[in-house]
């Protein structure tokens, strides 16, 4: 409802526009069907192997929290705070630019000074926190599950982090948004040269 009230649902999200461009380059003509397939695939992934960390944690037979669980949940909570702060800083920046009647400016304040996409990095770390917290539960399944099933669950658990990284950087996150930012923001290319795309770090001196 908030997005609708702000008029954000009146046009296609940039990441979907970018997907259409990618499909056209790969000679996919039925982009509407491709969009439906991708949406269904994302829903299936979210309801299956991407949910494995949550399934493991919720089905844990362990009575007390282990060290890994405490570390994982701490990373989870800190990452949520990190993402919230990043979103707040971006929103505050946009409001200030609107107040000053400045358009197409680059947000490089706060967390955005250290990575071009602190919100995506934080979201990835949220998943990593859950993965770490689920490891003790996964280990406890060794005696109750078949060896091959146990190994397959472990592989899926490891790939959850990798898949989320690829998704947040290349498919629906950083790269698609930068495709348009570089076109409409004159200073964005300079920002790209000086600031890491995903992992936080100090600015590069050219």
Which residue ranges define each predicted feature?
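Hydrophobic transmembrane alpha-helices
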Residues: 43-89, 98-206
């Amino acid at each position: 409802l908030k997005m609708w009230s702000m008029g954000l649902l009146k046009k296609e999200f940039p990441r979907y526009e970018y997907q259409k461009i990618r499909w056209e380059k790969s000679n996919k003509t039925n982009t509407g069907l491709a969009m439906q397939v991708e949406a269904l695939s994302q829903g299936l992934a979210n309801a299956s192997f991407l949910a494995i960390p949550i399934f493991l944690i919720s089905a844990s037979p362990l009575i007390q929290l282990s060290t890994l669980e405490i570390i994982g949940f701490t990373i989870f909570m800190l990452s949520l705070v990190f993402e919230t702060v990043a979103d707040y800083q971006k929103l505050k920046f946009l409001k200030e630019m609107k107040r000053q009647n400045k358009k197409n400016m680059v947000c490089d304040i706060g967390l955005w000074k250290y990575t071009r996409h602190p919100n995506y990095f934080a979201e990835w770390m949220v998943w990593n926190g859950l993965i770490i917290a689920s490891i003790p539960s996964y280990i406890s399944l060794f005696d109750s599950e078949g060896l091959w099933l146990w190994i397959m669950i472990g592989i899926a658990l490891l790939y959850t982090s990798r898949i989320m990284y690829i998704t947040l950087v290349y498919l629906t996150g950083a790269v698609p948004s930068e495709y348009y930012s570089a076109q409409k923001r004159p200073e964005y290319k300079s920002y790209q040269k000086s600031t890491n795309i995903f992992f936080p770090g100090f600015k590069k001196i050219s």
